[in-house]
């Protein structure tokens, strides 16, 4: 069997990390990279940590030049956070008859906020015989799929609290902007009031995924709250900077109600360089049920590595999947791939033979 052929679209913090990870793996190769601006015409190896060595070069190109019909088995789409912004790119890729894994947060469960676009993506994917998945560390695993997994050992579930205390330091400029890193408290509050500050993108998706997975019908729209985390020391991450007195993070909560009762709560304070101020990161799944569940992982699963690994490790599942739009609750569970990618892929499902 030919190696699994991968195109990466977007070579920022996440896309570049996926390239580095793929280059360490067996049975898979990067056959194209899509970029823009000054990146066009440069070598992929100019933008990632892995040296080229004796590998064949991969030149960054425009979408129309790199993504041609059946040019790869999958495109890792590492741009955008919102389904509506990612839609045209997804449409372009699936119409070239290539599978898609998107790191856009809303794509983890697009039916939560964009049901019509989700139906259209599903239709386009089926029409072209390919599959589409959105995943990442969160949404995609920690605050939703992991929670769902832990309900599997419960006879009854009365309520759920999913908490993630994490560092934003690995993430790129798009996330820094969404979280308001470096702005003043006044600018943050104005952004919240005007709806221009996204904060964490994914509560609707995580709550919707959990509710649908275990059979709860939400009785009211999902709500969320958003508060600034103000730093008293200067903090600098690879892609963000917050001077003392400004915003270094965003504390968000999300709430899902069933029959008027709070059943699913999300608690998600995240900031750059939390260790500078003694904040202990961690992931927590707290289920009030039969039995009670109190799962703790501390420090947190790092968001950057986690998102990179989730997207790369789901490649076999999306290639093998039936055509259409998928989510993490209808595909085989993610797992590390320590052997050859080809061993996990059905030959008839492979696009590049």
UniProtKB/Swiss-Prot annotation:
GO MF annotation list: 2,4-diaminopentanoate dehydrogenase activity; nucleotide binding
Class of this enzyme: oxidoreductase
Entry-linked Gene3D superfamilies: NAD(P)-binding Rossmann-like Domain
Keyword terms, alphabetized: NAD, NADP, Oxidoreductase
Enzyme Commission identifier(s): 1.4.1.12
Keyword Nucleus in record: no
Any one Gene Ontology BP term: ornithine metabolic process
Pfam families: DAP_DH_C, GFO_IDH_MocA
Signal peptide boundaries: none
Activity control: Inhibited by p-chloromercuribenzoate, iodoacetate and N-ethylmaleimide.
Reactions mediated catalytically: (2R,4S)-2,4-diaminopentanoate + NAD(+) + H2O = (2R)-2-amino-4-oxopentanoate + NH4(+) + NADH + H(+); (2R,4S)-2,4-diaminopentanoate + NADP(+) + H2O = (2R)-2-amino-4-oxopentanoate + NH4(+) + NADPH + H(+)
Chain's role: Involved in the ornithine fermentation pathway. Catalyzes the oxidative deamination of (2R,4S)-2,4-diaminopentanoate (DAP) to yield 2-amino-4-ketopentanoate (AKP).
Subunit structure: Homodimer.
Family membership noted in the UniProt record: Belongs to the DapB family.
UniProt protein name: 2,4-diaminopentanoate dehydrogenase
Organism: Acetoanaerobium sticklandii (strain ATCC 12662 / DSM 519 / JCM 1433 / CCUG 9281 / NCIMB 10654 / HF)
Gene (UniProt): ord
């Amino acid at each position: 069997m030919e190696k699994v052929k991968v195109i990466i679209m977007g070579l920022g913090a996440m896309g570049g990390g996926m390239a580095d990870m793929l280059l360490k793996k067996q049975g898979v190769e990067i056959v194209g990279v899509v970029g823009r601006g000054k990146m066009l015409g440069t070598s992929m190896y100019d933008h990632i940590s892995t040296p080229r060595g004796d590998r064949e070069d991969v030149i960054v190109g425009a979408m129309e030049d790199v993504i041609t019909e059946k040019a790869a088995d999958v495109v890792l789409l590492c741009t955008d956070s919102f389904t509506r912004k990612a839609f045209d790119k997804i449409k372009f890729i699936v119409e070239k008859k290539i599978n898609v894994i998107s790191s856009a947060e809303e794509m983890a469960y697009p039916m939560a906020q964009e049901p019509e676009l989700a139906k259209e993506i599903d239709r386009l994917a089926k029409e072209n015989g390919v599959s589409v998945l959105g995943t990442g560390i969160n949404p995609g695993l920690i605050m939703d799929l992991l929670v769902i997994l832990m309900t599997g050992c419960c006879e009854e579930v009365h309520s759920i609290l999913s908490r993630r205390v994490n560092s934003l330091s690995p993430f790129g400029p798009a996330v820094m902007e969404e979280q308001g890193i470096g702005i003043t408290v006044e600018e943050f509050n104005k952004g919240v009031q005007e709806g221009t500050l996204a904060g964490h993108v994914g509560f609707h998706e995580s709550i919707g995924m959990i509710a649908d997975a275990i059979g709860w019908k939400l009785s009211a729209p999902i709500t969320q709250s958003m508060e600034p985390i103000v730093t008293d020391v200067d903090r600098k991450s690879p892609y963000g900077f917050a001077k003392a007195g400004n915003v270094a993070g965003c504390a968000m909560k999300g709430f899902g109600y069933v029959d008027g009762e709070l059943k699913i709560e999300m608690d998600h304070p995240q900031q750059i360089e939390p260790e500078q101020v003694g904040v202990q990161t961690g992931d927590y799944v707290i289920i009030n049920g039969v039995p009670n569940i109190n799962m703790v992982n501390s420090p947190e699963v790092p968001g950057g590595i986690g998102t990179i690994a989730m997207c790369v490790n789901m490649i076999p599942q999306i290639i093998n999947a039936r055509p259409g739009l998928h989510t993490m609750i209808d595909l085989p569970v993610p797992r590390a791939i320590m052997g050859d990618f080809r061993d996990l892929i059905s030959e008839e499902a492979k696009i590049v033979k």
